């Protein structure tokens, strides 16, 4: 027989295609679609047949089956869109992930349908019912693998009634237990609504070949019955073949490989046996006598056997040259595993594998000829090597086929092989040795069960290269047989013959190009192979004949629609059958708590009774139940299925499986205000989410008594001030209010901080009651209105310049309305001494003020823009030079100094500093303009022109006056304004601005300057008192019967934004631990059958921010939260008219804000904290959660655990803590058998210095879950859960009480370090507790031993205390510390103090701030923020090893470091450690930057960068002819920057550019100017008296430094924006960036 033999079926001549258009869908979307007009009339026939009924289309590959499916999908969608059919989806099933991707892309290209793709890679297995409903609701067609659909149907996430059309790609698989068959049998036939079915296949027979026509007919009938469809085959294929041309079948024969390598094989076998013995010998060490190491050994031995088998197969079938490539491939795959393995036992076994491979490679290379590679490059090299037996004839034949292709690069050839290793090795051989330089060669393998398989992404990438012609020769397994579209494939070679008819038909169909060839490589003289080929070809004829000519009812079979063993949930319709329950039980066990040393899994034990099988199922200890016995059954496999079915029923009844029969997981929190179309809103309790809330009114300040006509009795509270500097005196005041304050609100003390370095100690003490008559009340009311408006507001509104009528606020007939929510009086006291027994109100000062107002009332005349003339005194007579005539009186010049006066023309209150004896009103006004030309000739001229005032005594000396100023927030410690390194103040007291005014324009007020100075302190004092009253009000609402200090509650509701000397941060930290502790105890007692994982999930849900937010909102806590700094400019006393109103634009008429979607935002631009005049303010949602935690912490500090429980229950947190259940726990533990471990337990008790009353608790606490595999039904996991919260509370409580002056952020770091697994593990090793651990894991023992060794080496090295060592810390060591704590806690009846007595010595020495070591990556990030540099990090992987590369650009040096590890976190830590070491060499460390950080955080708290600059600074003018891009390797092209011109926009854009290019942050400096009058900017008069100019310096590494000065602005941030904008424009000129506004 000739080597080349033509195919049995010659290709018929092609026919022209008919033009029969398919009805199109109405356009719906904007996506263009490709033409779906049927290629041939035959396809139209198939389509119409499918419309008439369920159809199985049998068509060759490439003939258009998928197009028919797309046409059907479009038709079904058209009916739904037209309203002709109810809303249902089309489900397109494909058996592989690759086909799912391919069909998804086809549907997207050829339709405008809304299509979704589902595969295992898309994590569909994690979807719940709601997610499925959402996805199905918004898509018209879903492409998925059949197992996903089967699972969705079983769990009732999807029902058959929701599907209008089922499309089965490669439907010949619908047999046996394949998901295709399961879908039909379990759900299709039992559904009241049955969707249409369309199946596609190239061959309906999936076996090795039908021996008779009858057998073929049986296969077809069975497929039709399963899919409830009829086979449809096109009889006349001529027209189809014009689009899918037939392939020429060519047989290539090769000689059998007769070379004998018995000597080599025997040596390889000896080595294999030898290394197998060495593997067995690994078990002799003590750590390897456990089940897990047995499993590793068994797996390792099987792997070695498989590797050996592959080598022998390659030697027998391919020859020793390719076998050497096989061994090299094995070495390359195992070496990375060996290098990165951290388990000593596994590493040792892998090293033995490597040794075997090296020995095998050495043996093989010994028999290979020298220079065989060069020989292969010669023309006859392969023939020579074949003759000598170094490559098989089969491989040589393949080489000759490739040679026959010539040098054409248009060849696209698929070479099918059976084994992955064959594809890899032959591909390497061809590419590396054979000289086929004109061809690009690669391989493509699949199969998720094989370690050698390529990932789906790599498969798709390789296939795309092949389609594009960038790969010519592609070695592949059966992954490309089914349905993969490679239309330009010119040749298909079956290096290994197809095993089934389907494989034959489908691989032949891959050759789609005209004149393509399908080459079968057949061993010469092998009759078995020839018969196999003949049977497959014969079956093709049988299939065609059966489909065309058989009788419709020729054969009939019974179809088992659904197994009799099922379980259904009536509420959802979820249904499971016995055969799927085993996997469901395994899935349930996978959800149980596990670690590296213990994987919970079910155990089946089958016994035989009277010839029947009965199975006992045992579940892990932490499952809902431990064992169940199934019914008798006819087979062992069925008995496992039935007992699993019974177990699933019981798990569902116990609530472990939900109503969809899915293992129960914690449902996501129910979030308020969220709907399906509002996904942009972040969840409650998050920082990103902003909510609008109101402010709770202080009830103690509410009232209407100021308007009472009768005598009123008020409570009095004396306010005294004592300055820490001599000579600074402040008058005392009295606060009068109707209600009586709590005894810890008054008396109270507070410190007021003044600049520079001045402090005023303030006390508020109750002084009993006082009765005021109507007259006194009126005068006191007038005094308060006069002074607070005169100092902080205005007594006159309107001006001559503005054109508005000048209006006196005290004009007759007008009364200032007092806010009923703020009702109190502040009156001066006569004696300003610090301690005063009696209370003496300074009525003279009060009445003097009233007299001044009366005088203005009586003298006010018609023209309200002119000063009343009768207020001005007569001309001075002779001899009165020492008398100064004021507006209301005349005084001796010696009495005028330090008096308080009121300006008639401005209505402002001043303090007289001195007389300016050498200056009168007739003198030049130029001095007031600081040397500039003045438009006024004199003071007389100035007052006449500006105010219309005629000076009557121009000869009088002017008075030098100190202007009144705005109130300041004096509650914020100015110590934070000190330079951390020098101690010098960073902010200085502003230069005082003085006024020069003629005396006759001033009204003298009979009050002292001490009284006036005290007014500036009162806003801060009253604000603090209001806060204390608010906290006291909240305390009354909570209603605990014991006293909780009001200062604690105030601290708990005060956020950092308030800029106070205290905040909720510390209490929040403590409250978090208290919540975790209380909820943990309650859950532990309440749910004795819940495992640790479930308890942890329940606790997390109970104390998460979303839950706490809900509780806080329920109690209206948001109204009490103090979330903004005290703003004295907006503070008003009762009777004071606000100069800075903030009208409410929130759309709410009440102070309370309802819970509604429109009052929630996640836009970061929303300003948080600033309230409107109704008290509405935007607040971070997390702030409310933080306050709940802080209040719990406050009550715990003030009243212990009982008070904390009270406030938690007040919030609505469900806490029971039934202590009767504790005795049940102890009783159950007492039954644990501890006799065999009594010596071990007593020894451990001695180390703990505590004797357990219930020894079983300690035994349970030291028992690892891995012992469950040996029959132990208890472990430490639940005790670990309890002990975790106990130790967390104890350590947090210790830190809170001990480190009172530590920053809250550092306190959090300390707690994290103290409760870390590393710290607990070190304590366990230090006290030798680990030796008592009961476990059944050799890997665990090995890791503990290695860690103990590493720990002992580091002992005594103080600098390495709690450093992150290279040796991984076994989590188990930390777990047993927590579990023992839980055991002690239970044994002592929940006595936390006794637990602390026992564990404090064990954990000592406790970490202190000076010993705290941050994780390297965290430390590096903080250091980068301090030095103003950006850290760049890139992650790659090499095998199982993760590689982290970090780069940090300093001023003129780029630091680069790498970290390698199997764990990404550890690799990141290693890289960060190397960067830190480099920085330390340059004198940069986090400790050195801490003092500077304090300075920077205060001066420019919104900008985290270094304000100092160094080095030479070049002006931007020097850069005009310099192209910076030439000196910057990092800038490849211009960076496109979005630029917002609003405040902060230019700075953000510049910072983003620096981050992208890894430049250091820019540096800013300020110059401030102060003016006597409001400054004019851009032609408009502003309300500001200060201006700022910012200078920006940007250092570009390895290039230059650019400096710019911005324009003048009224605040620092705007000045920074101006400078940043100029810098951006220059960088754009230099072609570094493109700014887009």
Swiss-Prot record:
Identify the residues that bind Mg(2+).
1214, 1309, 1312
Gene, per the UniProt record: DCL3B
Q: Which residues form the Helicase C-terminal domain?
A: 404-556
What is the recorded name of this protein? Endoribonuclease Dicer homolog 3b
The answer to keyword Metal-binding applying to this record is yes
Q: State where the protein is found.
A: Nucleus
Q: Where is this motif: DECH box?
A: 169-172
Q: Which regions are flagged for Basic residues bias?
A: 20-29
PAZ domain boundaries = 882-1006
Tell me which residues bind ATP: 59-66
Q: Where is the composition biased (Pro residues)?
A: 9-19
Q: Where is this region: Disordered?
A: 1-40
Gene Ontology molecular function: any one = metal ion binding
| One annotated Gene Ontology cellular component of this protein | nucleus
> So what does this one do?
Probably involved in the RNA silencing pathway. May cleave double-stranded RNA to produce short 21-24 nucleotides (nt) RNAs which target the selective destruction of complementary RNAs.
For the RNase III domain, which residue ranges apply?
1031-1200, 1241-1389
Where is the site described as Important for activity found in this chain?
Answer: 1305
Q: Which UniProt keywords apply?
A: ATP-binding, Endonuclease, Helicase, Hydrolase, Magnesium, Manganese, Metal-binding, Nuclease, Nucleotide-binding, Nucleus, Repeat, RNA-binding, RNA-mediated gene silencing
Domain (Helicase ATP-binding) spans 46-222
Q: Which family does it belong to?
A: Belongs to the helicase family. Dicer subfamily.
Entry-linked PROSITE patterns: DICER_DSRBF, HELICASE_ATP_BIND_1, HELICASE_CTER, PAZ, RNASE_3_1, RNASE_3_2
Q: Which cofactor does it need?
A: Mg(2+); Mn(2+)
Quaternary structure annotation from Swiss-Prot or TrEMBL? May interact with ARGONAUTE1 or PINHEAD through their common PAZ domains.
| Root EC class | hydrolase
Q: Name one GO biological process term.
A: siRNA processing
């Amino acid at each position: 027989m000739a080597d080349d033999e033509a195919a049995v079926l010659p290709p018929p001549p092609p026919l022209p295609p008919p033009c029969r258009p398919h009805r199109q869908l109405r356009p719906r979307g904007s996506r263009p679609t490709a033409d779906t007009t049927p290629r041939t009339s035959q396809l139209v026939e198939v389509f119409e047949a499918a419309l008439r009924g369920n159809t199985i289309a049998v068509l060759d590959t490439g003939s258009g089956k998928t197009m028919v499916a797309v046409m059907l999908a479009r038709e079904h969608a058209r009916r739904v869109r037209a309203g002709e059919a109810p809303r249902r989806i089309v489900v397109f099933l494909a058996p592989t992930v690759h086909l799912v991707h391919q069909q998804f892309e086809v549907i997207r290209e050829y339709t405008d349908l809304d299509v979704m793709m589902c595969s295992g890679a898309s994590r569909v297995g994690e979807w719940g019912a709601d997610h499925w409903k959402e996805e199905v609701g918004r898509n018209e067609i879903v492409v998925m693998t059949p197992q996903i659909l089967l699972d969705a149907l079983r769990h009732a996430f999807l029902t058959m009634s929701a599907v209008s059309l089922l499309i089965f790609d490669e439907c010949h698989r619908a047999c046996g237990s394949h998901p295709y068959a399961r879908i039909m049998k379990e759900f299709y036939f039992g559904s009241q609504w049955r969707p249409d079915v369309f199946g596609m296949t190239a061959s309906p027979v999936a076996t090795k070949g039908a021996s008779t026509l009858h057998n073929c007919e049986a296969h077809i009938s069975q497929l039709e019955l399963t899919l409830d469809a009829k086979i449809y085959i096109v009889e006349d294929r001529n027209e189809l073949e014009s689009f899918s041309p037939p392939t020429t079948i060519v047989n290539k024969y090769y000689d059998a490989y007769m070379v004998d390598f018995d000597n080599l094989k025997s040596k390889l076998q000896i080595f294999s046996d030898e290394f197998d013995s060495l593997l067995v010998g690994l078990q002799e060490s003590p750590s390897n006598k456990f089940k897990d190491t047995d499993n590793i050994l068994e797996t390792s031995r099987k792997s070695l056997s498989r590797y050996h088998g592959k080598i022998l197969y390659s030697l027998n079938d391919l020859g020793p040259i390719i076998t050497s490539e096989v061994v090299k491939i094995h070495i390359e795959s195992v070496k990375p595993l060996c290098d990165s393995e951290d388990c000593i036992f596994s590493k040792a076994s892998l090293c033995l594998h490597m040794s075997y491979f090296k020995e095998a490679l050495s043996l093989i290379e010994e028999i290979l000829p020298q220079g065989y590679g060069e020989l292969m490059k010669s023309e006859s090299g392969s023939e020579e090597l074949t003759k000598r037996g170094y490559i098989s004839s089969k491989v040589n034949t393949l080489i000759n086929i490739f040679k026959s292709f010539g040098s054409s690069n248009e060849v696209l050839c698929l070479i099918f092989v059976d084994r992955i290793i064959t594809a890899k090795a032959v591909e390497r051989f061809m590419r590396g040795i054979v000289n086929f330089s004109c061809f690009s060669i690669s391989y493509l393998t699949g199969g998720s069960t094989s370690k050698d398989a390529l990932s789906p992404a790599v498969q798709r990438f390789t296939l795309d290269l092949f389609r594009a012609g960038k790969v010519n020769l592609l070695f592949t397994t059966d992954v490309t047989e089914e349905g993969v579209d490679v239309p330009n494939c010119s040749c298909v070679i079956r290096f290994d013959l197809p095993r089934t008819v389907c494989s034959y038909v489908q691989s032949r169909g891959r050759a789609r190009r005209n004149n393509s060839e399908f080459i079968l490589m057949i061993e010469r003289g092998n009759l078995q192979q020839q018969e196999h080929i003949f049977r497959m070809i014969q079956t093709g004829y049988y299939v065609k004949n059966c489909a065309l000519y058989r009788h419709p009812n020729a054969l009939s079979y019974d179809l088992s629609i659904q197994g009799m063993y099922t379980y259904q949930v009536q509420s959802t319709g979820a249904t499971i059958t016995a055969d799927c329950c085993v996997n469901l039980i395994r899935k349930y066990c996978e959800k149980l708590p596990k670690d590296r040393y213990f994987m919970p899994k079910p155990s089946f034990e089958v016994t035989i009774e009277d010839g029947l099988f009965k199975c006992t199922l045992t579940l892990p200890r932490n499952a809902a139940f431990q064992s169940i016995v199934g019914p008798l059954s006819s087979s062992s496999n069925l008995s496992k299925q039935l007992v699993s079915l019974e177990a699933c029923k019981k798990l569902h009844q116990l609530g472990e499986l939900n109503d969809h029969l899915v293992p129960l997981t914690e449902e996501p929190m129910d979030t308020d205000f969220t709907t399906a179309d509002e996904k942009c809103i972040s969840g409650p309790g998050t920082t990103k989410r902003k909510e609008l809330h109101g402010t709770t009114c202080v009830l103690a300040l509410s009232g209407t008594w100021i308007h009472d006509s009768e005598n009123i009795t008020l409570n009095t509270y004396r306010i005294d001030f004592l300055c820490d500097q001599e000579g600074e005196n402040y008058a005392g005041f009295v606060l009068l209010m109707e209600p009586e304050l709590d005894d810890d609100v008054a008396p109270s003390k507070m410190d007021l901080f003044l600049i520079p370095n001045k402090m005023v100690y303030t006390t508020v003490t109750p002084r009993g009651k006082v009765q005021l008559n109507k007259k006194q009340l009126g005068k006191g009311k007038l005094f308060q209105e006069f002074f607070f408006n005169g100092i902080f507001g205005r007594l006159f509104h309107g001006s001559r310049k503005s054109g508005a009528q000048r209006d006196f606020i005290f004009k007759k007939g007008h009364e200032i309305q007092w806010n009923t929510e703020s009702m109190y009086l502040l009156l001066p006291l006569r004696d300003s001494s610090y301690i005063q027994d009696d209370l003496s109100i300074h009525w003279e000062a009060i009445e003097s003020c009233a007299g001044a107002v009366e005088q203005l009332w009586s003298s006010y005349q018609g023209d309200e823009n002119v000063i009343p003339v009768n207020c001005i005194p007569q001309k001075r007579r002779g001899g009165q030079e020492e008398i100064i005539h004021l507006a209301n009186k005349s005084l001796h010049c010696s009495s005028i100094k330090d008096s308080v006066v009121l300006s008639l023309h401005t209505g402002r209150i001043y303090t007289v500093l001195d007389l300016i004896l050498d200056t009168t009103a007739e003198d030049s006004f130029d001095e007031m303009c600081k040397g500039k030309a003045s438009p006024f000739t004199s003071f007389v001229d100035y007052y006449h022109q500006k105010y219309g005032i005629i000076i009557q005594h121009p000869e009088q000396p002017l008075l030098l006056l100190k202007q009144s100023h705005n109130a300041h927030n004096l509650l914020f410690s100015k110590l934070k304004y000190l330079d951390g390194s020098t101690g010098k103040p960073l902010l200085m007291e502003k230069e005082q601005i003085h006024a020069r005014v003629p005396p006759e324009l001033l009204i003298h007020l009979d009050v002292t300057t001490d009284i006036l100075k005290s007014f500036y302190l009162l806003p801060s004092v009253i604000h603090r008192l209001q806060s204390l009253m608010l906290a006291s009000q909240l305390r009354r609402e909570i209603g605990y019967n014991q006293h909780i200090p009001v200062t604690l509650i105030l601290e708990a509701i005060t956020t950092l934004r308030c800029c106070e000397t205290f905040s909720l941060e510390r209490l929040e930290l403590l409250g978090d631990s208290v919540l975790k502790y209380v909820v943990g105890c309650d859950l532990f007692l309440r749910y004795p059958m819940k495992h640790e994982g479930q308890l942890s999930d329940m606790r997390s849900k109970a104390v998460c921010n979303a839950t706490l937010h809900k509780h806080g909102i329920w109690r209206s806590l948001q109204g009490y939260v103090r979330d903004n700094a005290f703003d004295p400019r907006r503070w008003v006393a009762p009777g004071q008219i606000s100069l800075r109103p903030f009208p409410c634009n929130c759309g709410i008429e009440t102070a309370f804000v309802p819970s509604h979607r429109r009052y929630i935002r996640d836009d970061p631009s929303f300003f948080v904290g600033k309230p409107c005049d109704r008290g509405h303010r935007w607040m971070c949602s997390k702030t409310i959660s933080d306050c709940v935690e802080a209040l719990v912490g406050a009550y715990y500090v003030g009243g212990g655990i009982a008070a904390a429980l009270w406030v938690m229950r007040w919030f609505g947190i469900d806490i029971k803590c039934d202590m009767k259940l504790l005795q049940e726990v102890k009783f159950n533990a007492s039954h644990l058998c501890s006799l065999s471990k009594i010596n071990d337990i007593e020894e451990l008790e001695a180390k703990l210095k505590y004797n357990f009353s219930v020894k079983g608790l300690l035994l349970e606490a030291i028992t690892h879950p891995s012992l469950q595999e040996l029959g132990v039904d208890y472990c430490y996991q639940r005790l670990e859960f309890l002990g975790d919260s106990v130790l967390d509370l104890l350590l947090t409580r210790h830190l809170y009480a001990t480190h009172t002056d530590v920053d809250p952020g550092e306190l959090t770091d300390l707690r994290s370090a103290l409760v870390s697994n590393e710290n607990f593990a070190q304590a366990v090793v230090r006290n030798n507790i680990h030796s008592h651990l009961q476990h059944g894991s050799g890997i665990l023992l090995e890791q503990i031993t290695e860690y103990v060794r590493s720990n002992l080496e580091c002992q005594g090295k103080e600098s390495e205390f709690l450093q992150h060592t290279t040796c991984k810390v076994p989590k188990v060591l930390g777990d047993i510390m927590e579990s023992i704590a839980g055991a002690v806690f239970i044994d002592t009846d929940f006595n936390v103090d006794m637990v602390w007595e026992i564990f404090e010595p064990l954990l000592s020495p406790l970490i202190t701030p000076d010993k705290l070591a941050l994780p390297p990556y965290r430390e590096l990030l903080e250091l980068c923020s301090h030095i103003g540099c950006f850290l760049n990090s890139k992650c790659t992987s090499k095998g199982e090893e993760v590689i982290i590369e970090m780069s940090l650009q300093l001023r003129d040096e780029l630091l680069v470091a790498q970290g390698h590890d199997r764990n990404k976190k550890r690799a990141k830590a290693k890289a960060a450690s190397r960067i830190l070491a480099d920085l330390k060499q340059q004198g940069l460390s986090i400790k050195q930057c801490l003092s500077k950080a304090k300075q920077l955080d205060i001066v420019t708290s919104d900008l985290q960068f270094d304000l100092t600059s160094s080095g030479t600074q070049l002006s931007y003018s020097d850069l005009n002819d310099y192209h910076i891009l030439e000196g910057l390797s990092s800038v490849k092209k211009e960076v496109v920057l979005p630029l917002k011109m609003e405040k902060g926009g230019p700075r953000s854009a510049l910072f983003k550019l620096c981050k992208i290019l890894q430049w250091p942050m820019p540096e800013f400096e300020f110059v401030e100017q102060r003016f006597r009058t409001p400054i004019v900017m851009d032609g408009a008069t502003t309300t500001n008296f200060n201006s700022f100019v910012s200078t920006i310096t940007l250092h570009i590494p390895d290039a230059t430094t650019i400096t710019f000065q911005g324009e003048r602005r009224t605040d620092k941030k705007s000045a920074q924006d101006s400078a940043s904008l100029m810098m951006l424009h220059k960088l754009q000129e230099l072609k570094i960036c493109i700014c887009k506004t």
